[in-house]
């Protein structure tokens, strides 16, 4: 069910039901302040994506991807936007979907996924990337809370393989190793592997999903024919410990040199 409101306060109380939120709710907010996009759970509110309409040129696609993706999950959705904005977004989005098989002009041609040294060995052995929940089901890892739970990520995030550019993936690896959300891009950590994958092929084969802010794949993604390059500390000339900033820069440089 979709609910549109003009005003919204992030709090533990759902303005639609008057009760506390449960996992069946998700919120998308158009704002005029802050960063381009911020996601997570704030002040006890449901998982939310806040999108700054003034600097996010793709806000209409982001909004409608969020609606499409979460509707398929059976979620109740709160959209904080004007009626005109919602109508405009739907007109722009007509003919599109969160699982469409063609890359959009705003989407990257290369997807990046970062992993720990231990997980990279497992990935090479099985020849595929697998979601956390798939690995738990196969007995490959012990069930424990993912690091994203500290940010308010919904439980179903563990059904997906997530991608992110820049230093984001290395921050996730570093945070896992440190046991807390460590946003310091210069903090020492042990790099694993930084994988570069062909986004157009992944989309064309029906794997790519869009949730309003992330690009991701559900359950399993074979390495072949999508993996373009795998960077490790050794392959980019880093000995021992590194930092998210150092490793991501060196890995990107190595990948760019073979393109």
Feature map (PLM): residue ranges:
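Residue-level marker of intrinsically disordered, low-complexity segments enriched
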Residues: 3, 11-14, 110-112, 121, ...
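Hydrophobic side chains in beta-strands
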Residues: 114-116, 163-165, 197
């Amino acid at each position: 069910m979709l609910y549109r409101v003009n005003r919204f306060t992030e709090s533990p109380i759902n303005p639609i039901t008057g009760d506390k939120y449960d996992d069946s709710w998700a919120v998308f907010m158009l704002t005029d302040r802050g960063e381009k996009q911020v996601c997570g759970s704030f002040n006890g509110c449901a998982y939310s994506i806040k999108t700054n309409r003034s600097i996010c040129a793709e806000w209409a696609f982001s909004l409608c991807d969020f609606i499409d993706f979460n509707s398929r999950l059976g979620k109740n959705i709160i959209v904080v936007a004007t009626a005109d904005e919602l109508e405009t977004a739907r007109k722009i989005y007509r003919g599109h979907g969160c699982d469409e098989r063609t890359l959009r002009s705003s989407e990257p041609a290369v997807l990046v996924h970062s992993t720990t040294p231990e997980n990279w060995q497992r990935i090479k052995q099985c020849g595929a990337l697998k979601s956390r929940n798939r690995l738990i089901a196969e007995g490959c890892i012990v069930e424990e809370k993912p690091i994203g739970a500290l940010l308010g990520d919904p439980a179903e995030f563990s059904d997906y393989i997530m991608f992110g550019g820049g230093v984001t993936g290395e921050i996730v690896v570093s945070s896992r190793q440190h046991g807390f959300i460590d946003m310091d891009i210069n903090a020492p950590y042990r790099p694993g592997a930084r994988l570069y994958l062909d986004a157009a092929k992944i989309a064309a084969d029906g794997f790519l999903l869009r949730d309003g802010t992330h690009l991701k794949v559900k359950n399993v993604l074979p390495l072949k024919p999508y993996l373009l390059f795998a960077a490790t500390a050794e392959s980019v000339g880093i000995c021992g410990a590194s930092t998210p900033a150092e490793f991501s820069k060196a890995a990107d440089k190595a990948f760019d040199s073979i393109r």
